Amino acid sequence: MTDSPRILIIEARFYSDIADQLVAGAMSALDSAGFEHERLKVPGVFELPAAICMALRSMEFHSSSNPYAGFIAFGCVIRGETDHYDHVCRESSRALMDLATKNAIALGFGILTCEDRAQAESRAAVDGKNKGGEAAEACLRMIEVKRHFRLIER
């Protein structure tokens, strides 16, 4: 085990092909920056905040010598015929923001909220909009902010 910074990538697998593209973009950015990463899979977007909360509790409980420096949450919600889309998008986004602000975590937000599959595919594609890479870059930048305020070792 090394002591290089680690990022936990939590991926909602409901749209597995979209998740794979998001993660590929993130892993490329993290590898380029020299960050180790670990992947954790959850069923859907609604489960992302709980998984991050569990990881935080585990770090407290086990006093890890190499805790996660940051987290990236990936998933996709595509509008359907009911208001389920609105509830999942709103509640998962709110819960992630609450976790980030209450626990001062570096979080890359990589949840795609799309009207249709074509939008999701173009945003997730590494050779397209590469939203996975963007979420990883956001996480890395927030780690720098934490370092600035001495909330994480340099």
Put a short name on every predicted segment.
Residues 85, 90-154:
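C-terminal binding/interaction regions
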Residues 20-21, 49-53, 82-86, 119-123:
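Short, well-ordered secondary-structure micro-motifs
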Residues 2-42:
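Glycine-rich phosphate/diphosphate-binding loop of Rossmann-like nucleotide-binding domains
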Residues 13-14, 42, 76-77, 112-117:
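Short, ordered loop/turn segments at secondary-structure junctions
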Residues 39-55:
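N-terminal beta-loop-helix "entrance" segment that forms/cooperates
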Residues 51-95:
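Glycine-rich phosphate-binding loop
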Residues 6, 70, 104-108:
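Proline-centered loop/turn at the N-terminus of a beta-strand
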Residues 16, 20, 24, 42-46, ...:
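Electropositive phosphate-/nucleotide-binding environments in soluble metabolic enzymes
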